[in-house]
Structure formats: structure tokens, C-alpha cells
Regions:
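Short Gly/Ser/Thr- and Asp/Glu-enriched loop/turn motifs at secondary-structure junctions
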Residues: 112-116, 155-158, 292-296, 346-350
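Gly/Gly-Pro- and Ser/Thr-rich, intrinsically disordered tail segments characteristic of DNA damage-repair
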Residues: 1-234, 247, 285, 376-380, ...
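DNA-contacting surface of Y-family translesion DNA polymerases
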Residues: 11, 192, 200-348, 360-366, ...
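Short histidine-centered catalytic/ligand-binding loop motif
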Residues: 120-122, 261-269, 313-322, 386, ...
């Protein structure tokens, strides 16, 4: 049943008005369009397989404790009668349709995920319209045109709008007028504040602070002293419902990447290497498709115990080559002794590769061989010049270690990464492959599985690092 909660019948006042709209159990409800007979039953949407995690759960399944991100095996134990549906719906189609409806309301729409967005409705007053009525109209259109339920919050800022939409679920609308902000916030738990995680909640609890009202009673100096200047000011502002962040209509990606969950926990270095290579090639292709270069990389590893670590790899030369990314990632795993020889000492459940510090390709690196061919520049001259530029800049090394493994400086010029940047020319090769794929098909040309740069042993890498430090000391 739809619910509407508001502090007064009309809008949120004549100040800033932000709506947060969140689709209810989005993946589940898209699947129900094809399986309406399952409506009202506990449903779990997840990829089929022994290592799957829950993507979405119906409210009937949530009543049994099932949550998104939970291992499917655990979800089955909590809700044994739940129907498990694989990911098969056209989620992007429905997501685009929802965003199109929101863009009809206002030009200021910030999509934050496939099923939620912020909308700045402040301009409605200029046209004599009620922002709350517009929010309800959007929900009505989504229900009528797409047969999907949604929840929304309307408030003076993004923080409050997000909290209101969460509180209105399922299928509701909650309006927070400016004069009732503290009435809304004070009785709630500090963990209900958007952005306050488990660590901050635990710290506040140690001081006897459990509600937002209790946190609001603390002075700014008290909060800064215990949580640091930035976090202290953030907590102080949130307790008063202060959030000045604008609705960002065009969000430029700051990072991109992917993860791979092994079918069974693995200690096989070849299996890990194959996963890294596949992730890296996909990542490189994605970078090139949007004209971006990675200024840094990060690796994510999850052991069989669910212990999770990330590791940064700093780069002196931006990359968009999947083969270069794979080589640098594998080198980092060996240096940190995540991979030793042909084995992995601690069984891995998941591996991930991410590109960070993204920059436009035209800002970051020399002209590629393919570009020079397209523009009529002598390919041999272009290749020689770009190889020289690569040699002068050197290669990116590894950054912060996963654990107690060997540390590797960000300015290293040796190692497999440097050889690839200086002599492998993988970026040019992969740009040419992209062009062939666009003209013919993705199956027309593939890299040979064995085409990788020769890798250094960890001992050689450490020895070179020691020599480099001696040279720097002299």
C-alpha cells in the first residue's frame, strides 16, 4: 500500500527542494513483470552458482533477514522457501525509462545508481508548481507506465531527502519541511545518518551517544577532538540537517573496474593469473572506449575467510592497455607474495582490478601508433618518438602493500611494467584491435593467451630495489 508522510499538506517551503527517488526492490520487481504469479512470495534475485551473492530480495524475503550482498547460501538458509531467480531482466531498459521520467520534471537530475537519483525541484516555484506534487506525479508515471513501485523523499537537501526516501519504503513518499528537520532527525539512531558507518557508530556508542539528538548536544570542539577536524565538522553538520552538496547533473567517472569470484577458493596461481588477465583486458577496452587513461590502479583480494584487502599501484605513465594493467597487477601480487611461484599461499575467494585517477586520453599520453596511421604521420617516426617519450618517463611501480610483503616505490623504472611501457607497445596494438573489432566483430581477432612480457622473479625485483636505493644514496 502506498504511504505518504509529510509535515504539512503542501510543499517543503520556498527554499531549496531536493527529491531522492529510489526504486523498491528494483531487480525483484523487474523480474516480477515476467513472473507476476510470484508476487507476495519471498524472492531472491542472484546469479546461479555456489559462490553467488544476493543482488536483490523482496520485502517478504527481507522479513526473514535476507539482505543484498549476502552470500546466496546464507540467504537460502534464512529463507528456505524463497524462490531464487537468476539475473535476466532488462534492468538497463527500465533504469533509462525511470531516468527519462525524472528528466521530464527537472533538468537537474543526478543518477547515483541504476535505480536511484536525486532531482533538484527548487525551480518548480518559479513556474507556480508544487514540488511535492511533482514528486508524486513522477512516482505515478513510473507505476502506470512501467508497473514498478518506487519510494521518494522530498526535503531541503540531499542528506534529508535520502533519509526520507529510506523511511518511506516501501512504495511511499515522505516530505520533510525545513521547520520540521530536527523533529525528523532527533529520535533517529546515529547509524540512520547517510554516511555514518559502523566504525563511527561504534565510536559514538562508546561515549554513550546513540541518537542524533544526543550527538547534536555535543559541541563542535568535542566532536573535532575525538573524530578529527573534517569528520567532526561533518558529524556536527549532519546532526543539524545541514548538507550543501549540489545535485550534479553530469558525473564524470573517477574510477572503473571489475571483480571475479572463483567458483571454489583457489590456491592455483595460473587460475588467479587468468582471472587477472581477463579483468584487465576488459578494463583496458572499457578505458579506451570512453577515451580515458588510468593514472593509478588498485587491486582487491578476498581470502576464503572473507578477509579483504586492497593494494594501490601508482603509475608514472598513464595506461589504457589491458596487457599493461595485467602485467602490473600480477607483478604486485608476486612482490607482495600473494602469489609465490605457481601457488597462492592463502586461498583466494575473489580478485578485483580497478583503474583510478582517470584522465582524458588526449591529456595524458603520447600519440598511439594507430592514431599516427589514421592521421597520416609516418608510423615509424611516431613509434620511435613515443618509445623515447616512454623511456624518459619510466614506468609505474607498486604502491601500498597488501600486508607484510615487499614494498615497491612509485617511481620504479625496472620490472615488467617498465618493459611493457617502453618496448611492448601494447596500447598501440590494442587500439588497432579495437578498430578491427568495430569494423568486423569482437571475434575477428583475439590476443594469444601466451603473449605476455617476461616476468621478473621476486628475488630479482628486490635485488634491483636494493641496488636502486644504493645508487640514490650515492
Amino acid at each position: 500500500m502506498e504511504q505518504t508522510r509529510t509535515g504539512k499538506a503542501s510543499g517543503a517551503g520556498n527554499g531549496r527542494v531536493i527529491m531522492h527517488l529510489d526504486m523498491d526492490a528494483f531487480f525483484v520487481n523487474v523480474e516480477l513483470l515476467e513472473n507476476p504469479a510470484l508476487r507476495g512470495e519471498p524472492i531472491i534475485v542472484a546469479p546461479l552458482g555456489p559462490r553467488s551473492v544476493v543482488c536483490s530480495a523482496s520485502y517478504e524475503a527481507r522479513a526473514h533477514g535476507v539482505r543484498s550482498g549476502m552470500p546466496l547460501s546464507r540467504a537460502r538458509n534464512l529463507s528456505p522457501n524463497a524462490t531464487v531467480l537468476p539475473l535476466r531482466g532488462d534492468y538497463r531498459h527500465y533504469s533509462r525509462a525511470v531516468m527519462a521520467i525524472l528528466n521530464d520534471l527537472s533538468p537537474y537530475v543526478e543518477q547515483v545508481s541504476v535505480d536511484e537519483a536525486f532531482v533538484d525541484l527548487t525551480g518548480a516555484y518559479l513556474h507556480g508548481q508544487d514540488p511535492v506534487a511533482l514528486a508524486q506525479r513522477a512516482r505515478d508515471r513510473i507505476a502506470q507506465e512501467l508497473s514498478l513501485p518506487s519510494s521518494a523523499g522530498v526535503a531541503p537537501n540531499k542528506l534529508l531527502a535520502k533519509m526520507a526516501s529510506t523511511g518511506s519504503k516501501p512504495n511511499g513518499l515522505w516530505v520533510i519541511p525545513p521547520e520540521r528537520v530536527q523533529e525528523f532527525l532527533d529520535p533517529r539512531k546515529v547509524s540512520d545518518l547517510w554516511g555514518v558507518g559502523a566504525k563511527s557508530t561504534e565510536q559514538l556508542s562508546r561515549y554513550g551517544i546513540h541518537t542524533i539528538a544526543q550527538m547534536r548536544s555535543m559541541s563542535l570542539d568535542w566532536l573535532k577532538e575525538r573524530f578529527g577536524a573534517a569528520q567532526g565538522e561533518h558529524l556536527w553538520a549532519m546532526a543539524r540537517g545541514i548538507d550543501e552538496r549540489p545535485v550534479i547533473t553530469e558525473r564524470e567517472e573517477k574510477s572503473m573496474g571489475g571483480e571475479h569470484t572463483f567458483e571454489t577458493d583457489t590456491t592455483d596461481a595460473q587460475e588467479v593469473s587468468a582471472a587477472i588477465r581477463e579483468l584487465s583486458l576488459k578494463l583496458g577496452k572499457r578505458l579506451r572506449s570512453v577515451g580515458k587513461l588510468a593514472g593509478g590502479l588498485s587491486l582487491k583480494i578476498r581470502y576464503s575467510t572473507f578477509e579483504t584487502h586492497t593494494r594501490a599501484i601508482a603509475l608514472n605513465v598513464p595506461v589504457d592497455s589491458g596487457m599493461q594493467i595485467a602485467s602490473l597487477a600480477l607483478e604486485a601480487l608476486r612482490v607482495d607474495e600473494i602469489v609465490v611461484g605457481q601457488t597462492v599461499p592463502r586461498a583466494l575467494r575473489l580478485i578485483g582490478v580497478r583503474a583510478e585517477k582517470l584522465a582524458r586520453a588526449e591529456d595524458g599520453v603520447q600519440q598511439t601508433l594507430f592514431d599516427s596511421i589514421q592521421s597520416g604521420v609516418n608510423p615509424r617516426s611516431a613509434q620511435t618518438a613515443s618509445a623515447t617519450a616512454s623511456t624518459q618517463r619510466g614506468s609505474g611501480g607498486a604502491g601500498k602493500s597488501f600486508g607484510n610483503g615487499v614494498r615497491s616505490g612509485s617511481g620504479a623504472r625496472s620490472g615488467s611494467g617498465a618493459r611493457l611501457v617502453k618496448s611492448g607497445r601494447w596500447s598501440e596494438v590494442e587500439h588497432v584491435m579495437d578498430a578491427i573489432h568495430r569494423r568486423y566483430s569482437s571475434e575477428s581477432l583475439k590476443p594469444a593467451s601466451g603473449v605476455v612480457a617476461p616476468e621478473q622473479k621476486v628475488e630479482e625485483r628486490v635485488e634491483q630495489k636494493a641496488e636502486q636505493k644504493v645508487e640514490e644514496g650515492n
